[in-house]
Amino acid sequence: MISLKSIVDKLYNLEDLSYQESYQLFDYFIKGQIELPLQTSILIALKLKKETSIEIAAAVEALFDNTKEFPKIKGDLAGIVGTGGDGFNTINISTTAAIVAATAGYKVAKHGGRSVSSKSGSFDLLESFGVNIELAPDQTKQCLELYNMGFLFAPFYSDGFRHIKEARTILKTRTIFNILGPLINPARPNKVVIGVYSKDLILPMAKTLVNLGIDRAVVVYGSGLDEVAIHDDTYVAEIQNNQIIEYKVSPVDFGIYTYAIKDLEGGLPEQNREIIKQILLGKGKEAHNAAVAVNVAMLMRLYDKDDLKQNTQEVLEIIKSGKCFNTLQQVINYSNK
């Protein structure tokens, strides 16, 4: 076993960790074997050094090895998720996009927790709608099979996350756990859209996904947002056949207008709930509908639907039909049986 002191000394010297060292470090983290002051020091050292794809992949495996098993789903399974921490407090676009994608016929496993850095995290929103977020894995699997939608509440699958919650709250900044969050979905989706909070993270995240053997994925950075942007360019790294292809898209590539970032500002859970409800009912504002649609359109690329404009129009029609709220309502009802 590698000693914690030797790992910490390397980090204080801003040296990269080996796969084994990173695995051991995050095993210590998740088992609560690191005191709070040292936790904060380690997280800051990693941030200053900049995390490598090897360190991230090793951390993911350590966290998976300390996570409850989720039953395997037949066929493709999608994930739409952001790292959080972009600082803009926009409405819950990835959560809404997941519900819309499920309505469009794609099985989506949404994994996350309550807010650490934003005003309203994905599971804050879901609870405000009345979703029972603490379903057992077999119940969540059945919900996925019935309604194409399943919510996996992170602390339910690994209670070790309680050991690092205080450090993350104290630091009030993005840490490696923002990066790890999208990668440790216990349902292990094979087609994922991951938004990152920094352009510098696109390639490390993409390389990590390749190292983890993910089938198809896109990593996106939307000019300040951890999702596909409707206010400016989105930088993309797409993974296919273990190859990483980098490119850039803009709102015109999706066939939509360019909006202002302030058009997407969210608020407290109750305010976000009402905004999201209107979108799902087909009564949302154009900017809100567009923001959700472009993210689902990007997911559809992973299913060999390459025409982003056509994808966006298909999704907008589904949103405007109001059927998406029915999907959420079915999940709410199922989760409270």
UniProtKB/Swiss-Prot annotation:
Pfam families referenced in this protein's UniProt entry, alphabetically: Glycos_trans_3N, Glycos_transf_3
Annotated transmembrane regions: none
EC number: 2.4.2.18
Co-factor remark: Binds 2 magnesium ions per monomer.
Residues reported in the UniProt entry to bind anthranilate 1: G82
Keyword field: Amino-acid biosynthesis, Aromatic amino acid biosynthesis, Glycosyltransferase, Magnesium, Metal-binding, Transferase, Tryptophan biosynthesis
Protein's pathway: Amino-acid biosynthesis; L-tryptophan biosynthesis; L-tryptophan from chorismate: step 2/5
UniProt xrefs under SUPFAM superfamilies: Nucleoside phosphorylase/phosphoribosyltransferase catalytic domain (SSF52418), Nucleoside phosphorylase/phosphoribosyltransferase N-terminal domain (SSF47648)
NCBIfam families tied to this protein: trpD
PANTHER family associated with the record: ANTHRANILATE PHOSPHORIBOSYLTRANSFERASE
Protein name (record): Anthranilate phosphoribosyltransferase
Lineage: Bacteria, Pseudomonadati, Pseudomonadota, Gammaproteobacteria, Thiotrichales
